Amino acid sequence: MNDLTRYKLTAGLPVPAGAKLIYCYLLDVSDRRGIAISVRQLGKSIGLSRSATRKNLHRLKHMDMLDIAPRYSEDGGRLSNRYRLK
């Protein structure tokens, strides 16, 4: 599926505008491996609060449109999640 088709499908999703905005932003900035970005940085980039960003990311995950993979440093510290569009 090409990007234009994904944008068109996004318009018809039964989700809030914030979720559509996140999906389109990730579509623009991510590659096949996805993108590693913090919820805070993602929200700041698109103008949403951290809580709204987090809720909408989980909505997209439950709709099976997004994979969320946790990342850890070598010493076990928590890093930002990796988001990959399906």
Task: Kindly give the residue locations of the regions a language model identified.
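Short recognition helix of helix-turn-helix/winged-helix DNA-binding domains
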Residues: 1-45, 51, 65, 76-80
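Winged-helix/helix-turn-helix nucleic-acid-interaction surface
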Residues: 54-86
